[in-house]
Design a protein with these regions (language model features):
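A generic hydrophobic-helix recognition signal that picks specific residues
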Residues: 13, 20, 99-100, 189
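Short, acidic Gly/Pro/Ser/Thr-rich loop/turn segments
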Residues: 31-33, 54, 110-111, 199-201
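Double-stranded RNA-binding/processing signature
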Residues: 32, 68, 98, 218-223
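C-terminal charged capping/lid subdomain of soluble metabolic enzymes
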Residues: 38, 44-46, 144-223
C-alpha cells in the first residue's frame, strides 16, 4: 500500500510517509514454512478484507478451517484475492483522502491495543483481530450492522485461532491511546465500520461512552 511509518510511545504509525515499493514479492512456499501463530497474523488482515468487501474470501473462510487453508492452493487464493482487493482500493485513493480509510477497519482499536501494551506481547494481527471484534460491536450499537452478521464475523475470527478477548487491557488506557490515532479529529477517534455484509463505511464519529461500553463488554477481560 505504500505506507511507511514508525511507532512511538504515544501511538502507532504516528510518524510516516507514503513511498510505493519497486516490487512486492509474495512467496507462497515461504508462507508454508511459517508457524501457526505467524500464519494467523496474516489471516487477520485477510479476514479484514473478507469482512469489508472481498466476498469470495468471506465464502472461502466460511467453508474452510485453519487446517484446510494451510494448503498451498488455499494460501494462493487468499494472498491473490487480498492483494487484488487492497490494490484496487489503494489505486483509487493512494494517500487516504477517503475510500482507503476502509482498510483501517479494526485498526483504530487494534493500534490502541498495541500502543497500550508497548508493542510487546501481542502481534499486529492479533491486535487487529481484537480491534475488529470491538468495531463489529460498535457497528451494531451504532445501528449500522445487524448482530447476526457481526456474530458470523467474530465466529470466523475464533475459528481461525484469533482471540477476541484479552487479559491485561483496560478501558481508560485504550481510550487514552485512541486519542493519538492518526484518524482522530478534535480529540475524538474516527472509525471505519460495517453497515452490512461487505459494506464498509469510514470517517464515522462514535460517542466516547459508546466506545467505552463496547470495550468493556467485548475485548477487555479481567485477570
Amino acid at each position: 500500500g505504500g505506507k511507511v511509518a514508525v511507532n512511538i510511545s504515544a501511538g502507532k504509525n504516528i510518524i510516516g510517509a507514503f513511498h510505493q515499493p519497486a516490487l512486492v514479492v509474495a512467496d507462497i512456499d515461504f508462507l508454508g514454512t511459517l508457524p501457526d501463530n505467524e500464519l494467523r497474523n496474516g489471516l487477520a488482515e485477510a479476514l479484514k478484507h473478507a469482512f469489508i468487501g472481498e466476498n469470495a474470501l468471506f465464502e472461502l473462510f466460511e467453508k474452510g478451517d485453519f487446517d484446510s487453508i494451510r494448503k498451498a492452493e488455499s494460501l494462493m487464493e487468499i494472498v491473490y484475492r487480498s492483494a487484488l482487493f487492497k490494490s484496487s482500493v489503494v489505486e483509487r485513493d493512494e494517500r487516504e483522502g477517503g475510500l482507503r480509510a476502509i482498510l483501517n477497519f479494526g485498526h483504530t482499536v487494534g493500534h490502541a491495543v498495541e500502543s497500550l501494551l508497548e508493542y510487546r506481547g501481542i502481534s499486529h494481527g492479533q491486535a487487529v483481530a481484537l480491534g475488529m471484534a470491538a468495531e463489529l460491536e460498535i457497528s451494531v450499537r451504532a445501528g449500522l450492522l445487524d448482530r447476526a452478521h457481526a456474530r458470523r464475523c467474530t465466529e470466523l475470527l475464533e475459528r481461525y485461532g484469533l482471540r477476541i478477548r484479552r487479559a491485561g487491557l483496560d478501558v481508560d488506557g485504550l481510550m487514552a491511546h485512541m486519542k493519538y490515532d492518526k484518524k482522530t479529529s478534535l480529540g475524538r477517534a474516527r472509525f471505519a465500520l460495517l453497515s452490512g455484509p461487505g459494506k464498509p463505511v469510514y470517517d464515522r464519529e462514535v460517542l466516547d461512552d459508546v466506545v467505552r461500553a463496547v470495550l468493556a463488554d467485548t475485548i477487555v477481560t479481567g485477570g
